[in-house]
């Protein structure tokens, strides 16, 4: 999947064709699908005009019901109507059964300890249930867009582990759908608001969904989202608001112990009341009992706020802890993005604004913001926005390397390498006793640093003070699936290391890439000559420095005539090294090497004599 329409110099790129891709928010309570059409990003509605699909699946003897149809039967058939399946993804049956929450489902255990739902159609696992939710979303997208999808971007919570992420991918694989990328929900929300285009700053993502609350603090720097800290409560969400309202109505109506069906009916009404109070100061709750009698009560916004206030305060406390973990204050947060339908609750917005000291971003529907960000990402990944700074490449367009002595570039990852990729190379010290090494990461095809693009600099300290060339520093370049480059330098004997992250594609357009490639061709011969000269100059400096140290220590092993000849040759090497004749420098170094071979042998003999002085043969 080529994302950049790049051609070699002198050739033309193939005509651009719009590729179909969508973003999917596979949510705990509701799921959505979004796409970029004619430059506009929006969620796609179903035939009834509904954008969100309830993440509910009901299994009957003959059919599988998904979404609103399944929700209608949830009160009458809770055992076979699976809601919030996302909570089961990647978790063991033991974890689920030992948790505080009880479920109406009948479980079985798989061979590897994962939960299986017992249904009229047999045993099904959370991955299969998730696939049933994805199925109508994919069908909706292909019907609306008029063709087969090239792939999808699916969002996942930032805290999802590898097993949960793999389960999400597997759900799509069951449908034969290609997953372009799994995108963290906080990052998707930030992308939807275009925050990725800002140079730098701290962003908070306040995500209060149906089943969970997540607060993520991100630092944006040159297109790279760095997660500073995450927090929240995996058992706090809009569902809990519903449960509190349900219990309140149950107490007011003096219902006492109720069965599963009535509890589900009350819960559905509580959710309706909660949504009504978003725009109204009061509303009427009403249910019809099995005997046909009707119960009514007026619920005010003040009543609702009083019920949920302790839970909202818990979310703010989580924000405070997470900011502390991130090492930033509320005043340093540039923007707060609201995600999740429960952030529509007025009290939530009021408390968030009071805590962060500024109104949160709410112009994009909080239920849809994650799906919209995923759609923007998907559109880029299939190559529909080649000029985007958010470009996430599946191949590396320009080589990545490190600066070495003399301003030379040592390429570590070559251009057109597919990602993700990791490459490592060993470097060593230039001087005796060197305890630190500065690294300069560059991008480009030219031979000298001056002609390449500077990406980042960092320093490795704590290198053992050894002779020049004795220390071994392993430098690893790792580019992940999102095009994020991590460079790590580690001294092998001690394990000390330092690293940095950078996004090579930030601020880089197709035109700039093409220009850099053309220049590398145009100046190839000249660059090679300049590199050869620089290499010989570096070698001359290394040889002269080493020889100066040797003469200072063991110069008395030479007579005056020998010392004079060596000094003269060294002066000649130093003089030639300031010029531009690489071959002359090379020959001068070779003459100096020949001239000092006898001196090197004497030094070796002398070192052996000193080492064995005073020792008997028996001790050797």
UniProtKB/Swiss-Prot annotation:
Gene Ontology MF term list: ATP binding; ATP hydrolysis activity; ATP-dependent protein folding chaperone; unfolded protein binding
One BP term from GO: iron-sulfur cluster assembly
Superkingdom to which the source organism belongs: Bacteria
Coiled-coil regions listed in the entry: none
InterPro entries: ATPase_NBD (IPR043129), Heat_shock_70_CS (IPR018181), HSP70_C_sf (IPR029048), HSP70_peptide-bd_sf (IPR029047), Hsp_70_fam (IPR013126), ISC_FeS_clus_asmbl_HscA (IPR010236)
Keywords for this protein: ATP-binding, Chaperone, Nucleotide-binding
Name of this chain's protein: Chaperone protein HscA homolog
Natural source organism: Shewanella putrefaciens (strain CN-32 / ATCC BAA-453)
Gene name of the encoded protein: hscA
């Amino acid at each position: 999947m080529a994302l950049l329409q790049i051609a070699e110099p002198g050739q033309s790129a193939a005509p651009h064709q719009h590729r179909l891709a969508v973003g999917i928010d596979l949510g705990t309570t509701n799921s959505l699908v979004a796409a970029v059409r004619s430059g506009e990003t929006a969620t796609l509605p179903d035939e009834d005009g509904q954008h969100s699909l309830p993440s509910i699946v009901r299994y009957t003897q003959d059919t599988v019901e998904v979404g609103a149809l399944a929700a209608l039967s949830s009160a009458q058939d809770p055992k076979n109507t699976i809601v919030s399946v996302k909570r089961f993804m990647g978790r063991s049956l033991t974890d689920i059964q030992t948790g505080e929450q009880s479920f109406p489902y009948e479980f079985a255990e798989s061979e590897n300890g994962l939960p299986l739902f017992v249904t009229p159609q047999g045993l099904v696992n959370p991955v299969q249930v998730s696939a049933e939710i994805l199925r109508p979303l994919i069908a909706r997208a292909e019907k609306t867009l008029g063709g087969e999808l090239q792939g999808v971007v699916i969002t996942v919570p930032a805290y999802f582990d590898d097993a949960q992420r793999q389960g999400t991918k597997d759900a799509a694989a069951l449908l034969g759908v290609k997953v372009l990328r799994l995108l963290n929900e906080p990052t998707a929300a930030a992308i939807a608001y275009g925050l990725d285009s800002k140079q730098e700053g701290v962003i908070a993502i306040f995500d209060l969904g149906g089943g969970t609350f997540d607060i993520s603090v991100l630092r944006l720097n040159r297109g790279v989202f760095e997660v500073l800290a995450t927090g929240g409560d995996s058992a706090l969400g809009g569902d809990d608001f519903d449960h509190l309202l349900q219990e309140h109505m149950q107490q007011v109506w003096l219902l006492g112990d109720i069965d599963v069906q009535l509890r589900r009916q009350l819960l559905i009404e509580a959710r309706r009341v909660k949504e009504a109070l978003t725009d109204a100061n009061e509303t009427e709750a009403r249910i019809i009992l099995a005997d046909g009698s009707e119960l009514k009560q007026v619920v005010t916004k003040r009543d609702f706020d009083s019920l949920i206030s302790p839970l909202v305060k818990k979310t703010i406390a989580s924000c405070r802890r997470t900011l502390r973990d991130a090492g930033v204050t509320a005043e340093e947060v540039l923007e707060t993005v609201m995600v999740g339908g429960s952030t529509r609750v007025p009290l939530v917005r009021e408390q968030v604004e009071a805590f962060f000291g500024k109104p949160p971003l709410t112009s994009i529907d909080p239920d849809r913001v994650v799906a919209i960000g995923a759609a923007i990402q998907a559109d880029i990944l299939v190559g529909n926005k080649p000029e985007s700074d958010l470009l996430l490449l599946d191949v590396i367009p320009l080589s990545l390397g490190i600066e070495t002595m003399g301003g030379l570039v040592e390429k570590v990852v070559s251009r057109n390498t597919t990602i993700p990729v990791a490459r490592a190379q060993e470097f060593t010290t230039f001087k005796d006793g060197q305890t630190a090494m500065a690294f300069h990461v560059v991008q480009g095809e030219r031979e000298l640093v001056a002609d390449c693009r500077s990406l980042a600099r960092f320093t490795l300290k704590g290198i053992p003070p050894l002779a020049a060339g004795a220390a071994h520093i392993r430098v690893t370049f790792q580019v992940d699936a999102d095009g994020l480059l991590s460079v790590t330098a580690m001294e092998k004997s001690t394990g000390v290391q330092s690293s940095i992250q950078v996004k090579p594609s930030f601020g880089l357009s197709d035109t700039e890439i093409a220009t850099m490639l053309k220049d590398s061709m145009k100046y190839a011969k000249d660059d090679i000559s300049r590199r050869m000269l620089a290499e010989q100059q570096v070698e001359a400096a290394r040889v002269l420095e080493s020889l100066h140290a040797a003469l200072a220590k063991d110069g008395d092993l030479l007579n005056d005539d020998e010392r004079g000849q060596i000094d003269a040759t060294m002066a000649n090497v130093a003089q030639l090294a300031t010029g531009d004749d690489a071959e002359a420098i090379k020959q001068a170094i070779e003459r100096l090497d020949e001239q000092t071979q006898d001196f090197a042998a004497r030094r070796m003999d002398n070192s052996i004599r000193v080492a064995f002085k005073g020792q008997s043969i028996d001790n050797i």
